[in-house]
């Protein structure tokens, strides 16, 4: 997993990406520019999209974009360059992970919430840049969405066992 990869990193920066996601052509370049400007953690807006653009997927996308679907994270809603509480698909200086330690391997999901909490405890900030955009495919069928949201809720509960403040 991530901890194995982090042990092998030889460069200055680490970019975390996940499944069901694609990026603007300048995604990596724009992340690197912000790191070169002195930021430790940087990312951009994550925009939910459909795969086939049919009416069923459009309806599920409306649900996904609500506060009940993807939540209230600033990286889904903000457009301006500012510090936010967390990021998806961020680029980190390698030294950040050296400072805060490895991912909690007991967490199969929501491990980034716990990791970001520890980063904030160490004083790191999360810069949202309007020049950085990622796109995440929303689930294309209702059963898939229900399964995903159930899993998210389950893992939030498990994560709270390890870190009660990482969702506040």
Language-model segments: residues:
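Glycine-rich, basic loop-to-helix element that forms the pyrophosphate-binding segment
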Residues: 1-9, 30, 87
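Short aromatic/hydrophobic "clamp" motif used to bind/position activated sugar donors
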Residues: 14
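The conserved acidic donor/metal-binding loop of glycosyltransferases
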Residues: 18-22
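Conserved donor NDP-sugar-binding/catalytic core segment of glycosyltransferases
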Residues: 25-58, 133
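A recurrent flexible, glycine/aromatic-enriched loop bordering the glycosyltransferase active site
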Residues: 70-95, 108, 114, 134, ...
């Amino acid at each position: 997993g991530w901890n194995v990869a982090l042990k092998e990193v030889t460069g200055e920066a680490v970019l975390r990406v996940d499944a069901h996601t694609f990026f603007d052509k300048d995604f990596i370049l724009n992340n690197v520019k912000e790191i070169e400007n002195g930021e430790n953690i940087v990312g951009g807006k994550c925009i939910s999209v459909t795969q086939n653009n049919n009416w069923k997927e459009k309806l599920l996308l409306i649900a996904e974009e609500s506060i009940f679907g993807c939540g209230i994270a600033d990286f889904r809603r903000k457009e301006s360059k500012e510090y936010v509480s967390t990021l998806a698909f961020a680029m980190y200086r390698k030294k950040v992970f050296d400072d805060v330690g490895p991912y909690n391997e007991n967490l199969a999901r929501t491990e980034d919430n716990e990791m970001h909490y520890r980063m904030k405890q160490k004083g790191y900030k999360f810069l949202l840049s309007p020049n950085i955009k990622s796109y995440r495919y929303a689930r294309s069928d209702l059963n898939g969405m229900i399964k995903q949201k159930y899993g998210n809720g389950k893992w939030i509960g498990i994560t709270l066992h390890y870190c009660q403040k990482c969702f506040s």
